[in-house]
Amino acid sequence: MSRQLSILIFIIFALVNSYANAGDDGNLKLNENKNGYVEVGDCFEKVNRGIFGFNQVLDKVNFKPLAKGYRIFPQPIRSGTSNALSNIGNVVTIPNNVLQGQFKDAGLNSARFVINSTLGIAGIFDVASYYGIKKRDKEDYGQTLGVWGAGPGCYFVLPVLGPTTIRDSIGSVVNMIGGDAWYNVTVANDTQYFSEADYYASRLLSGVDFRAKNLESFDSLENSSVDLYASVRSLYLQDRYRKIRNIDKTTDTLSDDDWEELDTQ
């Protein structure tokens, strides 16, 4: 059985499970709490908490020190890095704009990508914003599935990668079978210009950049939370709910772009 067919079977199985809570009329019966956010089942909580604890140790030993070291670099260098990573992210955002019917945003993001990739020197400089083409909301395949009506399925925690749901994990699989142009240029089609190492280096840099932006936020969350695992789960699920419905509202602790690197599964 080919790798692509195996992945397709997994997607179908997971989608069936994500629709398991649909009523007889086919409409999803999602439970919303008093804040309006969908409550997602934590089907593997004991395992999730164990993996979360492992990730916390990994963060303290590796990512947090790397993030602190990264902050030594001058702000212009860090801003340029963030801009370049955001520019690469457009290769996932643009097709999802189209899939969600956001054709205006697809056009604007395409213009941003072309301008910043050329005049902005591989996206290091946000020239498009200078010309009035402002950064749009990031989209991904997990969000698209949500817009199409797929339920989130169970919440779970992945080693190293952190929080996700069945639906968002399917979005990550879509990247591997053609949805992420950057992945396909580097990993799937190793060329003389880009290699698999370039892709994974960019993902590692994304994680370090994300962590560096949120050193104080995470410290504050850790110090103020009675149950850190539950707090992170709540923040992640609220953020995903908000992005799928394009709600202009931030979570209690983290800023609007805080989870963007975690969303690119």
Model regions and ranges:
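Alpha-helical scaffold segments that form or flank carboxylate-/histidine-based iron centers
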Residues: 46-47, 76-83, 106-116
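Sec/Tat signal peptide C-region and signal peptidase I cleavage site
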Residues: 16-24
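Short, membrane-interfacial amphipathic segments enriched in basic
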Residues: 36-47, 59
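Bacterial N-terminal signal peptides
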Residues: 8-16
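Mid-length scaffold segments of soluble, non-membrane domains
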Residues: 87-166
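Bacterial N-terminal signal peptides that target proteins for export
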Residues: 1-7
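A structured, mid-to-C-terminal "fold-capping" secondary-structure block
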Residues: 23-38, 148-265
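Membrane interface segments of multi-pass transport proteins and intramembrane proteases
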Residues: 61-79, 131, 142
